[in-house]
């Protein structure tokens, strides 16, 4: 329970920072209707959607915002899905992301301790179409070459092969 409360708190803090700075944010799911920011004109609340619809929406979005939950040393499928759908992934930092991605080249990251800098990072992407396309293209190539389920299966098979030796 405490874990879930923390995740909701962090996610709402990120959204609050963006909408209070004038950035419009589309969110999905009925739980947002209970948010203290539900009446903010910059928070656009949509109904729940399924996984496939989520991928379609990512493909139509210039930016896909991700907030990591408990795995601060890894990454989530949402990051790869955003990249594979040509959407700039904006996510909080993890040790894995910092080691495997390049800020401003194939991902945009933010630090939760400096959340006040996030709106400017998002505005920069929204205002610079060339930058957006540059990040999207690089992210797509990175995800396609390193972060598909086939890539993961090959990696696990390699590990298993090394264990058998």
Predicted regions and their residues:
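Conserved catalytic-core segment of nucleotide-activated headgroup transferases in glycan assembly
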Residues: 1-59
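Catalytic binding pocket for nucleotide-activated donors in carbohydrate/polymer assembly enzymes
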Residues: 37-164
């Amino acid at each position: 329970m405490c874990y879930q409360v923390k995740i909701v708190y962090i996610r709402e803090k990120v959204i609050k920072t963006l909408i209070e700075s004038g950035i419009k944010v589309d969110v999905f799911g009925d739980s947002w209707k209970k948010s203290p920011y539900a009446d903010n004109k910059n928070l656009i609340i949509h109904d729940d959607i399924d996984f496939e619809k989520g991928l379609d929406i990512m493909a139509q979005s210039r930016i896909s915002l991700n907030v990591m939950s408990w795995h601060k040393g890894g990454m989530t499928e949402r990051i790869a899905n955003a990249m594979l759908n040509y959407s700039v992934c904006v996510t909080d930092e993890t040790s894995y992301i910092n080691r495997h991605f390049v800020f401003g080249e194939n991902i945009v990251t933010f630090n939760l301790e400096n959340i006040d800098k996030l709106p400017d990072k998002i505005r920069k992407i929204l205002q610079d179409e060339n930058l957006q396309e540059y990040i999207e293209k690089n992210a797509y190539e990175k995800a396609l070459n390193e972060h598909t389920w086939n890539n993961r299966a090959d990696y696990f098979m390699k590990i298993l092969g090394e264990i058998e030796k």
